[in-house]
Amino acid sequence: MKARLLILLCALSATDADTICIGYHANNSTDTVDTVLEKNVTVTHSVNLLEDSHNGKLCRLKGIAPLQLGKCNIAGWILGNPECESLLSNRSWSYIAETPNSENGTCYPGDFADYEELREQLSSVSSFERFEIFPKERSWPKHNITRGVTAACSHAKKSSFYKNLLWLTEANGSYPNLSKSYVNNKEKEVLVLWGVHHPSNIEDQRTLYRKENAYVSVVSSNYNRRFTPEIAERPKVRGQAGRMNYYWTLLEPGDKIIFEANGNLIAPWYAFALSRGLGSGIITSNASMDECDTKCQTPQGAINSSLPFQNIHPVTIGECPKYVRSTKLRMVTGLRNIPSIQSRGLFGAIAGFIEGGWTGMVDGWYGYHHQNEQGSGYAADQKSTQNAINGITNKVNSVIEKMNTQFTAVGKEFNKLEKRMENLNKKVDDGFLDIWTYNAELLVLLENERTLDFHDSNVKNLYEKVKNQLRNNAKEIGNGCFEFYHKCDNECMESVKNGTYDYPKYSEESKLNREKIDGVKLESMGVYQILAIYSTVASSLVLLVSLGAISFWMCSNGSLQCRICI
């Protein structure tokens, strides 16, 4: 009995066998990503796909300065409000920047027809040629071209008028019928602007135009309207009881526009040959101009980013990331980051790919840790790591390329009478925005899930590669590790790692050691059987003695009577 117990203890106290483990990289990263099934998964490496920062400034777009309207709006600039005269020298721009509450628009009160459509047209214009469509000094010899000024459009405390229009009035007591035409020979679209004056009383009508009933006719291939003055008492705006309505049209190359009137015409003086650009636009912003350059401008500030998404502003100009409402879009490129608990020892549960990664393996994503008489160490599997890096890099680049459709997204303009249309447009835009956001988030969630599964598969494949080489020359110990049945020096370990392990070379030694271990197991089973029988017999004897003692005591004090009958 003692001999058998001694054999068991000797077997249990044998030296540790050589061991090799398959595992993966871990580090001190705190990056977290979301997947379809999990939230806030800590990973070793990830890339951010969402830009959330800007510089708060208006910048040059690809080296071209914007047109800053300052205190003027689009109407004041294009009509030539005297307070906006300095803007007329600008011939080209990357985009137009307008402040939210610009004060200089139409100086003489009135309506600007189709103003929102004009803004939309100008949002795609990157330069124009300003030219005299009807030269001031020789186009209107029978009409007065100097009296048409007003205190409403004053400049430097003097009455003035729009710099692109002429207010024609009577000359020498008459206002002859006029007819003036222009043929577009600019080989570009030409923007033509004019106006119609509506006096507040008949006396002003007679004084200015020498007739009570007047008309203005404007005709081109695509435009045909006849206007009559509406003479009526109105509340004063900017000191004026009268009104001017402003109109515009685009004249195609080769087309002809004809103006006929016998009064009340605010005639074109300058027109604009338009050049359109793909990257232009109009933004409304309080941001100030700075000495900076960018590829993407928003009302909040410039974005310098190659990321596919941004959550700064839906209105963008230039090559910009797609706007989404997300607050986080991070794509995993590494592995689950589960550093091993070092206090649990090098081998055991922490060494495998099941419960934790290795912070000590820094030169690859997947690899090995071995222990033998010559020592221990980590080694990355460079081939599987590089294949994984290439695959994930290509995937990330593909996702960014597919989603990184950079473009200009300008706001749409609606007048006060189009409120229902504006509300409907907002709902449609919100719907598209929700779809874009959902698609972006779902794409990232799915790709993160696939990447983490991809890493798990790679570790498993590496494990199976080692298992298929070792076969029964080693045993699995259930944590990503194998315990050799033979001595495996560093050369042997290296052969396992590079896939050249010589199974027959170690088969005989492994077989002998395996049989010894199996013998010890059988011997141990015999010892355990003897101990079990001994324990059962001893327990039964103790129970019988105890019952006998109790019976004897009860008989002696009369508590138990025993009768023996023959």
From Swiss-Prot:
The record marks R344, G345 as: Cleavage. The gene is HA. It comes from the Viruses. Keywords: Clathrin- and caveolin-independent endocytosis of virus by host, Clathrin-mediated endocytosis of virus by host, Disulfide bond, Fusion of virus membrane with host endosomal membrane, Fusion of virus membrane with host membrane, Glycoprotein, Hemagglutinin, Host cell membrane, Host membrane, Host-virus interaction, Lipoprotein, Membrane, Palmitate, Signal, Transmembrane, Transmembrane helix, Viral attachment to host cell, Viral envelope protein, Viral penetration into host cytoplasm, Virion, Virus endocytosis by host, Virus entry into host cell. Disulfide bonds join C21-C481, C59-C292, C72-C84, C107-C153, C296-C320, C488-C492. InterPro entries: Capsid_hemagglutn, Hemagglutn_HA1_a/b_dom_sf, Hemagglutn_influenz_A, Hemagglutn_influenz_A/B. Homotrimer of disulfide-linked HA1-HA2. Interacts with human CACNA1C. Residues 18-529 are extracellular. It is a single-pass type I membrane protein. Binds to sialic acid-containing receptors on the cell surface, bringing about the attachment of the virus particle to the cell. This attachment induces virion internalization either through clathrin-dependent endocytosis or through clathrin- and caveolin-independent pathway. Plays a major role in the determination of host range restriction and virulence. Class I viral fusion protein. Responsible for penetration of the virus into the cell cytoplasm by mediating the fusion of the membrane of the endocytosed virus particle with the endosomal membrane. This is Hemagglutinin. Major glycoprotein, comprises over 80% of the envelope proteins present in virus particle. The extent of infection into host organism is determined by HA. Influenza viruses bud from the apical surface of polarized epithelial cells (e.g. bronchial epithelial cells) into lumen of lungs and are therefore usually pneumotropic. The reason is that HA is cleaved by tryptase clara which is restricted to lungs. However, HAs of H5 and H7 pantropic avian viruses subtypes can be cleaved by furin and subtilisin-type enzymes, allowing the virus to grow in other organs than lungs. The keyword Lipoprotein applies. It comes from Influenza A virus (strain A/USA:Albany/12/1951 H1N1).
